[in-house]
Regions:
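Conserved N-terminal subdomain of the carbohydrate kinase-like
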Residues: 44-126
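Glycine-rich phosphate/adenosyl-contacting loop at the front of the ribokinase-like
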Residues: 1-70
């Protein structure tokens, strides 16, 4: 199949500590990470979004282009500034994020920024693109448009609660996006937040009953992944790894998953899903080392 994978959302400059009291300028943002990951795996990826027409924005556009990501729909916005995030790491390699620019250029995405979609293509989005207008309406329009064209939607909430002024807006947008998604990737914490259950089996059952996604994956870190495909549920153990920095691990997992799904289609059963999930887990594990 090898359908194109469009990734919509924010391209972010991450400022990472170097251990010497300085911050390093690094390309980041979950959607941008996924787009680059797909391209590195040999997939056909394109980025949809806005960055500022500023040094950080031009840096991000150049970086993605160098990685063979289609940037024809990555707009430089002279009126807005590129999203910039300070990343802080604890002794276990876990991270916290401080968003320095709000609202940033990515939240000014307009319908005219969208490409024409085609059958067999994928669109991957995260909830940050839904956190404010006009990006929210444009993102939902993109999800609906690719479904009408015969394509597929992948959704990774990647919830950042501090970016939402109204908690009910967050829940309403999550519900709408989850209902449109063919493939959903959640963390355990996100599953509990959305389903209202701390039990992973119960949470998966509630989401499957409510939203009926074709594929639902719940990542559990070192414990592996719970996968629900067309009503079948199974656990896939994690690959052992010594984590140095978990930043971007979930994005690498999604890139591996989407590369497999775009190449082979959504499988009919869990046995057929196993190779694509193994690739996703390998990508996620390698990203932490």
């Amino acid at each position: 199949m090898n359908g194109k994978i469009w990734v919509l959302g924010d391209a972010v400059v991450d400022l990472l500590p170097d251990g010497e009291g300085r911050l390093l300028q690094c390309p980041g943002g979950a959607p941008a990470n996924v787009a680059v990951g797909v391209a590195r795996l040999g997939g056909d990826s394109g980025f949809i979004g806005r960055v500022g027409d500023d040094p950080f924005g031009r840096f991000m556009r150049h970086t993605l282009a160098q990685e063979q990501v289609d940037v024809n729909y990555m707009r430089l916005d002279a009126a807005q500034r590129t999203s910039t995030v300070v990343v802080d790491l604890d002794s276990h390699g876990e991270r916290t994020f401080t968003f320095m620019v709000r609202p940033s250029a990515d939240l000014f995405l307009q319908p005219e920024d969208l490409p024409p979609f085609a059958a067999g293509q994928w669109l991957h989005v995260c909830s940050i693109a839904l956190s404010a207008e006009p990006s929210r309406s444009t993102t939902f329009a993109a999800m609906e448009a690719i479904k009408r064209a015969g394509g597929y939607v992948s959704f990774d909430p990647n919830i950042r609660s501090d970016l939402w002024q109204d908690p009910q807006d967050l829940r309403d947008c999550l519900d709408r996006a989850l209902a449109l998604a063919d493939a959903i990737k959640l963390s355990e914490e996100e599953l509990a937040f959305i389903s209202g259950s701390d039990d992973i089996v119960s949470g998966i059952a509630r989401l499957n009953a409510r939203f009926q996604p074709t594929l639902l994956l719940v990542t559990q870190g070192k414990a592996g992944v719970q996968a629900a495909l067309r009503g079948q549920v199974s656990h896939f153990p994690a690959r052992p790894v010594v984590a140095v920095d978990t930043t971007g691990a979930g994005d690498a997992f999604v890139a591996g998953l989407l590369a497999g799904l775009a190449a082979h289609g959504i499988p009919d059963n869990l046995a057929a899903l196993a190779p694509d999930l193994a690739l996703a887990q390998t990508c996620g594990a390698l990203a932490t080392t």
